[in-house]
């Protein structure tokens, strides 16, 4: 961007440099001397004010010029409106017309509305509101936000300033090429074709979710899973009566809420598994609430009906209490009794799923570029970044250029749920896609774009936007934030780095761990990613005083050596709950100990003896409990505590004793207290630490 020096502009305007500098300072454009430079916008503004002025007498010309430069920015803007609208005519007509324009603007401004983007500079806000930027800067500084005229502020702060000036504020919705791509155009009814339902199986841990899926798809993964609990989200296709059903398997424990939520966003039908012997459990209630919130139809599979302790009617009663009344009881909830182990009722369950799918009238357009959702992503040896994708509309084909979040790629290969290579995948089909530039995030929307070059450009732009948003948020500094950060010096932090084999595990661990935070200890996951533990992870942990948690991954050799050198703690796990329990234990070490008072006993002072060199000793009778030699005590007189301290000596007759039980007499010497009187009550107690 070219810049103009003050003396060059003065020469062009036929003014002296001194006069121009004076007038620029009046406009809050700070220049030091004739060699100072001006931005193009500033030059344009000044030229706009002085160019094409009607030729008049020197006196009138000078007066007009002075008036212009004495106006504030609002007047300048009004002058520009006036000049643009009324360039011709006599000076008298111009003045009259200007008044008319200003009156009209004033009437329109009674309800002033401005549109503000997510971020804008102080200068841009001033231009929108037609006020002096200096005034805005003053108001922001008063709120503790230090900014310059070209520094960006966020929508929230900009809106507050605008409201102070009487403006109604709307947020600008900027639609770039990315958002336009994400906005799916509605399909014509004639292009839509029936598609298979996508079914998610949910339920309480150990209620037989995986076993039910095994029975449905005739596979056996239960024994391969660590701890008998599904660790990763899988997808499979089942065919019945020449119709297909797609099953998603979301883990059923509370720790995997994030993974479950992701599964339900693309789900058409939910099968809720409830054990006939256990009934409704906490995770069952959680799953029901999630399904209700997602407004997805639900079928209840009452599993383990082959067990002697099975009680399906009790399950139905408990479900009814939660608003899921079975059809046979006059409600709308389909309940199917099944036994995954004995293969009972499986066909009936599948028929019910197809029936509900038919009622839902599930359709999609296969004859268009594909759109879908990443349900799982990982880095696989020999394959590189691999993602499981559910195609939701259109058809995904080999060679398609794809975009998912900030990751781009080209479909090099596709595998179906049986591991077979396929060339295309239609609506509802789950496929494993190879060809991504990096590991995408689970939950990202996948879209097909015209070519790989375009996909790369869009992915890079998304990355830039993310960095820009992060940078802008970092630039927001207020006195309030600064004060709270100083105050938080007393809050202890436990920093954690998570590395796992799949993205879903990273998310689940992150949420579970961060939920353990409390008022005294804040747990902060500073990094989470897929892949082995590297030297970079160890260096980050060393710099941040963090613990590294590896889930189903191992540290590289160099990383292990570096961790020993840097004294970085690496914990490796194969079951998620063990990781959470260990973190809880680590937290206890950071918590300030809490104590509670435990009363040991009460003794009444019945005589006071003066012992030379020792002081007063209380002759006492133990009313309740026991008095210990090392216990804390308080002396109570007429219901008022007169002293708190410790026992200096405890004797029975002339012997020192460790404790005196209820009903016995003893002599108690109190540390640094001689004002003991007959009738005083001595309460003995000790402080016990409360387990955290």
UniProtKB/Swiss-Prot annotation:
PROSITE patterns: G_TR_2, IF2. Transmembrane segments: none annotated. Residues 339-341 are annotated as: G5. It is found in: Cytoplasm. GTP binds at residues 203-210, 249-253, 303-306. Gene3D superfamilies: 1.10.10.2480, P-loop containing nucleotide triphosphate hydrolases (3.40.50.300), Translation factors (2.40.30.10), Translation initiation factor IF- 2, domain 3 (3.40.50.10050). Its main location: cytoplasm. GO terms for cellular component: cytosol. PANTHER family: TR-TYPE G DOMAIN-CONTAINING PROTEIN, TRANSLATION INITIATION FACTOR IF-2-RELATED. This is Translation initiation factor IF-2.
